């Protein structure tokens, strides 16, 4: 059976009934949906930090997780052992990608030189496993937020020595990405923001991080690292206010600092909620602006105001996400769905690592099937066409084509009575729209055998 006491997870469809929990009911990797295999639409990835390092602690209690590699007490021995466990889990789940922070995979030494040596040993083993299994690196990144040195940020730190250290750490991380063939490279600024504006030079800090990003882009070009760079927005936590607040803020930052040719966005569901948005909103903003890069698949609890990193089980949300992906044609140029999620503290058995990923993978596969059915029927397209039909001719067409002035609009409107203006509006029938989406969910999934 291997290192994990779990068999390879297979697709069974709906034939074995809803209670079969160690199998995929909807994720059929090679099933063709909208012209591509399901696995190529979804491109699932496993997050190293939550899956192999998360001990399931919370602010009120110690970890509950049972993990087989805890028998290795030496940090380096455990780090090397995790590589074997990780790649067996990838294969048993049928997941073709993974993601990690540099400090996830190897323990830190006292100096950057010592830490880099530790990284090299683990990366050697990861590279061997990648070659033998065919599993690929969706993206890597650098942890510039966990160590106390980054208490006031990394590339926005008021302390130049810390900024310099962060640059050295990034250099090594980019080299690892190049070596392992990472398809993307993510920047998440957990400490890049402020706690209080009274002691913060905001423009200076954002200029500093822009310079940092330009240095990273220059070095990637120098070493031939062609991964897509991604910024991951989050409004807060751990910092009171983070500079990459949401998709719109991050895009504006990129435009202001001449970084639009280098970066796209990696968007996360729970981060969208913390910013007061739906996940679909953030994806729509990025998609329509040309900045959709990759997705972190998780969800938050709508009643709790912090980052829960739950595995995605909200089918309505995954339908919305996959609808946006279908309109885009892919999850960015090289993106995927990375499960930036952890089992609940009460789901602490080894097998729960598999159960949780199965739940997330099936929920996104189901979302894809429903979104595809809606897309084939043209339901949303027809809805949009009808709602905006007044712009197909007359004054509306002139507005769309930029052929009118304010004076033209005034002349058109001056003598129109209120009754005519009210008559020009139409009901959205919004409740029926939502009910129809529910019907599509039921109908599309009932067709799965």
UniProtKB/Swiss-Prot annotation:
Q: Which residues bind Mg(2+) 2?
A: 268, 271, 307, 309
Q: How is the cofactor bound?
A: Binds 2 magnesium ions per subunit.
One annotated GO molecular function is: magnesium ion binding
Keyword Cytoplasm among UniProt keywords: yes
Which sites bind Mg(2+) 1? 232, 268, 296, 340
Reaction(s) the record says it catalyses: alpha-D-xylose = alpha-D-xylulofuranose
Q: Which UniProt keywords apply?
A: Carbohydrate metabolism, Cytoplasm, Isomerase, Magnesium, Metal-binding, Xylose metabolism
**Is Electron transport a UniProt keyword of this protein?**
no
Q: Which cofactor does it need?
A: Mg(2+)
What PROSITE patterns does this protein's entry cite?
XYLOSE_ISOMERASE
Main location per the UniProt record:
cytoplasm
Protein location: Cytoplasm
What the entry lists under InterPro entries is as follows: Xyl_isomerase-like_sf (IPR036237), Xyl_isomerase-like_TIM-brl (IPR013022), Xylose_isom_bac (IPR013452), Xylose_isomerase (IPR001998)
GO CC aspect terms:
cytoplasm
Q: What is its EC number?
A: 5.3.1.5
Active site: residue positions:
101, 104
Q: What superkingdom heads the lineage?
A: Bacteria
Which biological processes are named by the entry's GO terms? D-xylose metabolic process
> Top EC class per UniProt?
isomerase
Concerning its family, UniProt says: Belongs to the xylose isomerase family.
State the oligomer form and interacting partners: Homotetramer.
Protein name, as recorded: Xylose isomerase
What is the scientific name of the source organism? Bifidobacterium longum (strain DJO10A)
Q: What taxonomic classification does the UniProt entry list for its organism?
A: Bacteria, Bacillati, Actinomycetota, Actinomycetes, Bifidobacteriales
Q: Which gene encodes it?
A: xylA
């Amino acid at each position: 059976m291997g290192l994990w006491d779990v068999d390879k997870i297979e697709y069974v469809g709906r034939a074995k009934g809803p209670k079969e929990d160690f199998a995929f009911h909807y994720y059929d990797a090679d099933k063709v949906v909208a012209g591509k295999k399901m696995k190529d639409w979804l491109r699932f990835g496993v997050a190293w930090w939550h899956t192999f390092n998360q001990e399931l602690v919370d602010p009120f209690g110690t970890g509950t997780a049972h993990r087989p590699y805890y028998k290795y007490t030496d940090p380096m021995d455990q780090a090397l052992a995790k590589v074997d466990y990780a790649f067996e889990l990838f294969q048993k789940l049928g997941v073709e990608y993974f993601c990690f922070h540099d400090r996830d995979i190897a323990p830190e030494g006292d100096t950057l030189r010592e830490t880099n040596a530790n990284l090299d040993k683990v990366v050697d083993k990861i590279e061997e496993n990648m070659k033998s299994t065919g599993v690929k690196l969706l993206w890597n990144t650098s942890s510039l937020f966990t160590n106390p040195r980054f208490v006031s940020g990394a590339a926005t730190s008021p302390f130049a020595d810390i900024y310099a250290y962060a640059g050295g750490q990034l250099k090594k991380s980019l080299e690892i990405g190049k070596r392992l063939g990472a398809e993307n490279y993510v920047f998440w600024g957990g400490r890049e923001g402020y706690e209080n504006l009274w002691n913060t030079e905001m423009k200076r800090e954002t200029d500093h991080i822009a310079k940092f990003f330009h240095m990273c882009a220059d070095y990637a070009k120098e070493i031939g690292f062609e991964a897509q760079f991604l910024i991951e927005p989050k409004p807060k936590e751990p910092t009171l206010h983070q500079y990459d607040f949401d998709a719109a803020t991050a895009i504006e930052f990129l435009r202001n600092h001449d970084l639009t040719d280098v970066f796209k966005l990696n968007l996360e569901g729970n981060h969208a909620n913390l910013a007061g948005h739906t996940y679909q909103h953030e994806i729509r903003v990025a998609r329509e602006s040309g900045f959709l890069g990759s997705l972190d698949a998780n969800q938050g609890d709508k009643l709790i105001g912090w980052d829960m990193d739950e595995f995605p089980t909200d089918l309505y949300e995954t339908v919305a996400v996959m609808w946006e992906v279908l309109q885009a044609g892919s999850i960015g140029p090289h993106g995927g769905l990375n499960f930036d999620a952890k089992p609940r503290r009460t789901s602490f058995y080894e097998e729960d690592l598999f159960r949780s990923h199965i739940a997330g993978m099936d929920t996104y596969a189901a979302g894809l099937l429903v979104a595809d059915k809606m897309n084939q029927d043209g339901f949303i397209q027809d809805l949009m066409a009808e709602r905006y039909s007044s712009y197909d001719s007359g004054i509306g067409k002139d507005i769309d084509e930029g052929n009118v002035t304010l004076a033209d609009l005034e002349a058109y409107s001056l003598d129109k009575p209120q009754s005519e203006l009210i008559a020009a509006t139409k009901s959205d029938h919004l409740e029926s729209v939502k009910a129809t989406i529910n019907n599509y969910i039921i109908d599309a999934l009932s067709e799965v055998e």
